[in-house]
Amino acid sequence: MTSHPPRNLGLDLVRATEAAALAAARWMGVGKPDEADQAAAEAMYGVLNTLDMQGRIVVGEEGKLGVHSPLDSGRMVGTGNGPEVDVVVDPVDGRRRLAQGHSDAISVVGVAPRDSMWSPSPAVYMEKIVVDRAAADAMVPECIDAPAAWTLALVARVKKKPVRDLVVFVLERPRHEHLVEEIRSAGARVLLRSDGDIAGAMMAAHPLIDVDLLMGAGGIAEGVIAACVVKALGGMMLGRLAPQTEEEWAAVRAAGLDTKAVLSCGELVRGNEIFFAATGITDGLMLEGVRLHGSEAETESIVLRAETGTRRKIHTVHRLTD
């Protein structure tokens, strides 16, 4: 039995994201994010268990719904045959956007060899900066603490465009009010989203999408998944623990975690045997959403393999059985 993921694993993973997207699409615009997430999680779990791998979920669903999910961290997925791998999942990235019928809700899964993914439990939040491959070599740890204007000027210089042409993805949160002011004062434009920072990282890292950076604090779970995407696309991500409450600070200190270390995507997910798949649930900048046509449905997905830099777009027509 090989310890290395097979080269076609990404094409198997996309079946899991397609199943999750199809299940979640039924809940688009009905105002019930928890129900959508639960349906997507169950569908994804069912497909993951058919894949020949010994998968351990490193970043899962616990904490989202207030109840246990089949995709909680620590759960094993796969047939029990095949390589030992770490698995990161988000059946619905952009839960609120999906519930409201908004754009860019996606279903995602990433896989890498066992023990290669950062898992700083019990920390919850981290600061993040993401750029594409054109600006990857310009990113330095100092960017995390530097004024936004400094980082924006750095990116603008290497991308040979004025700061006013830059677009920065930021989660719309009270904690980001000052960051948004900084970005706008520097002359750049802000793409504010209520949630979906995995999609935001994909936009910032993708060379063909007109989003230049992701900045701000978000979940560690989403950060580890984003690191898989960014590494596979050849971009760069910087991250650092950023506890948001006294309780989280206390837990992080008790665990002896380093809150000063700035990590790159290569440290968040080690090695190059990384596979990532995403399927659109609602229409977005990167992927079309699910199209339901009675007894059939259409999906659009992206499959990434870090080792080769391969990027596949897949359009699928599904025959529905219920």
Please give the residue ranges for each predicted region.
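Solvent-exposed alpha-helices and their adjacent loops that cap or buttress functional pockets
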Residues: N49-T50, M76-G82, D90, A99-H102, ...
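General beta-strand structural signal in soluble alpha/beta enzymes
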Residues: I57-E61, V87-V89, L98-Q100, S119-P120, ...
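N-terminal subdomain of lithium-sensitive/metallo-dependent phosphomonoesterases centered on the IMPase/IPPase/PAP
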Residues: M1-V88, W150, I198-A199, M203, ...
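Acidic beta-strand-loop-alpha-helix segment within the catalytic core
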Residues: V108-R193, G284-R291, S295-T321
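Glycine-rich phosphate/nucleotide-binding loop
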Residues: V230-G284
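Short acidic, glycine/serine/threonine-rich loops at helix termini
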Residues: S69-P70, Q100-H102, S121-A123, H178-R184, ...
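DPxDG-like acidic metal-binding loop motif
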Residues: G82-D93, R97-W118
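Gly/Ser/Thr-rich active-site loops/lids in small-molecule metabolic enzymes
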Residues: A188-I198, V211-L213, G218, E222-A254, ...
